[in-house]
């Protein structure tokens, strides 16, 4: 009987990508098959995220629930990876001594070896280093799971925003070689993938070396990906406004495969707070780039990230953020109350704003963002949208669902499952709070 792997993933798309590569690795090297139940597993993996507050508590709480499984089956291997593992390192075993393997985002390629050594020696294995040899050099070809795929094009971040742990947990920016990325996407396309999302913590800072020694930027990468037979839709995330270049704007205007949707985090509309965050741009500079983009690509949707209650944020600062939201007109966006991350510069800043005030501001901001996002959905009613059909509807097996260019789920009645993995034209009948309803056009 094949041995089983259970994997739980917290956090961002990069973690989802990393988890998929862990499955590929362990499937190839140890013939592990994924199971949906931790109690059936021979190996349990927890891929962690440290962006939000209480991330460590969430990790130890989950590990505590698996303690009884380990006691019942001492041969089971429990491994913890991701950004909390990178931050905590061997300290994870101080609170959860039954954990066998601790590895960081840059050492996941060593996972099969670490599991083998832990099994043989019965000794814990910990490696949260940032090796110079890229993990991508040691990964097998990616497993295909549907018509959409994530492709990591770079790792880490060198911006060192004062609130962010990424440079400390994933290291400095390292771009994958250009030809390696293209080879991976060709493999995906040959196996039925129609949409790729190019991933990086600062993806528009991509600078990949080509076979002839040149450095190619993200715009050039997008143009070459668009020329790959079978790839019909391209996304990328997450971007930094500083490196949102004219060449990228030109790519948005000229590459039809690149979706009319951009996620460009701004965090705040206050120049004072942006400076304290070390974002190195102003609200006006952010808006100027979006005006140029919208002039080149009319109708493009913009989503963003916002942090409310950053240390020292005044009511005036918050109102400047609300004004930015009005000026830009965002699609559905992500927003959070600031959470202190140990080891970051912002963790040492005085924070005198009451939590109740922060929550009140967050509610007001989210309410307005949701209004703006729903208005975009409402304006889509009566239009025909080309969607990539991805699966059966979550609520009705008699329906299929897919995504629009601006990343909205569309549910529509259809009794032809062969449409899954294909593009289809759907007439939008109505807008729901978090999805659209449509009718398939023949």
Curated annotation (Swiss-Prot):
Its cofactor is [4Fe-4S] cluster. Its EC number is 2.8.4.3. SMART domains: Elp3. Gene3D superfamilies: Methylthiotransferase, N-terminal domain, tm_1862 like domain. Its main location: cytoplasm. [4Fe-4S] cluster 1 binds at residues 12, 49, 83. Residues 143-375 form the Radical SAM core domain. [4Fe-4S] cluster 2 binds at residues 157, 161, 164. GO terms for molecular function: 4 iron, 4 sulfur cluster binding; metal ion binding; N6-isopentenyladenosine methylthiotransferase activity. It comes from the Bacteria. Pfam families: Radical_SAM (PF04055), TRAM (PF01938), UPF0004 (PF00919). One of its GO terms (cellular component) is cytosol. Residues 378-442 form the TRAM domain. Binds 2 [4Fe-4S] clusters. One cluster is coordinated with 3 cysteines and an exchangeable S-adenosyl-L-methionine. It catalyses: N(6)-dimethylallyladenosine(37) in tRNA + (sulfur carrier)-SH + AH2 + 2 S-adenosyl-L-methionine = 2-methylsulfanyl-N(6)-dimethylallyladenosine(37) in tRNA + (sulfur carrier)-H + 5'-deoxyadenosine + L-methionine + A + S-adenosyl-L-homocysteine + 2 H(+). Keywords: 4Fe-4S, Cytoplasm, Iron, Iron-sulfur, Metal-binding, S-adenosyl-L-methionine, Transferase, tRNA processing. Residues 3-120 form the MTTase N-terminal domain. HAMAP family: tRNA_metthiotr_MiaB. Belongs to the methylthiotransferase family. MiaB subfamily. Catalyzes the methylthiolation of N6-(dimethylallyl)adenosine (i(6)A), leading to the formation of 2-methylthio-N6-(dimethylallyl)adenosine (ms(2)i(6)A) at position 37 in tRNAs that read codons beginning with uridine. Monomer. This is tRNA-2-methylthio-N(6)-dimethylallyladenosine synthase. It comes from Pseudomonas fluorescens (strain ATCC BAA-477 / NRRL B-23932 / Pf-5).
């Amino acid at each position: 009987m094949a041995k089983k792997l259970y994997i739980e993933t917290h956090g961002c798309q990069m973690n989802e990508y990393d988890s998929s590569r862990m499955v590929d690795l362990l499937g190839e090297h140890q013939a592990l098959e994924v199971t949906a139940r931790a109690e059936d597993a021979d190996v349990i993996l927890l891929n962690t995220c440290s962006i939000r507050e209480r991330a460590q508590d969430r990790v130890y709480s989950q590990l505590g629930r698996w303690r009884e499984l380990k006691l019942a089956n001492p041969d089971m291997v429990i491994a913890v990876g991701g950004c909390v593992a990178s931050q905590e390192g061997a300290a994870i075993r101080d609170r959860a001594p039954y954990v066998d393997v601790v590895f960081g985002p840059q050492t996941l390629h060593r996972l099969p070896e670490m599991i083998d050594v832990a099994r043989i020696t019965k000794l814990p294995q910990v490696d949260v280093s940032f090796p110079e040899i890229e993990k991508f050099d040691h990964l097998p070809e990616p497993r295909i799971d549907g018509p959409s795929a994530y492709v990591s094009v770079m790792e880490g971040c060198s911006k060192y925003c004062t609130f962010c742990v990424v440079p400390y947990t994933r290291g400095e920016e390292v771009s994958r070689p250009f030809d390696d990325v293209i080879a991976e996407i060709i493999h995906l396309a040959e196996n039925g993938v129609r949409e790729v999302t190019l991933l990086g913590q600062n993806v528009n800072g991509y600078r990949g070396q080509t076979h002839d020694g040149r450095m190619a930027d993200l715009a050039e990468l997008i143009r070459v990906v668009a020329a790959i037979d079978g790839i019909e839709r391209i996304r990328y995330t997450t971007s930094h406004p500083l490196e949102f270049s004219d060449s990228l704007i030109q790519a948005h205007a000229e590459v039809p495969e690149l979706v009319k949707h951009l996620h460009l985090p701004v965090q705040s509309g206050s120049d004072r707070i942006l400076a304290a965050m070390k974002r190195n741009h102003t609200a006006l500079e952010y808006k100027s780039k979006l005006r140029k983009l919208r002039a080149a690509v009319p109708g493009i949707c913009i989503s963003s990230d916002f942090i409310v209650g950053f240390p020292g944020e005044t009511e005036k600062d918050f109102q400047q953020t609300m004004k930015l939201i009005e000026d830009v007109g965002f699609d559905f966006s992500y927003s959070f109350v600031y959470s202190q991350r140990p080891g970051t510069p912002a963790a040492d800043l005085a924070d005198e704003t009451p939590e109740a005030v922060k929550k009140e501001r967050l509610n007001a901001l989210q309410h307005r963002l949701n209004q703006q996002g729903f208005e975009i959905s409402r304006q889509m009613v009566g239009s025909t949208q080309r969607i990539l059909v991805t699966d059966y509807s979550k609520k009705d097996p008699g329906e299929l669902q897919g995504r629009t260019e601006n990343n909205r789920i569309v549910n529509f009645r259809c009794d032809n499952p062969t449409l899954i993995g294909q593009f289809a034209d759907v007439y939008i009948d109505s807008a729901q709070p978090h999805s659209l309803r449509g009718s398939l056009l023949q």
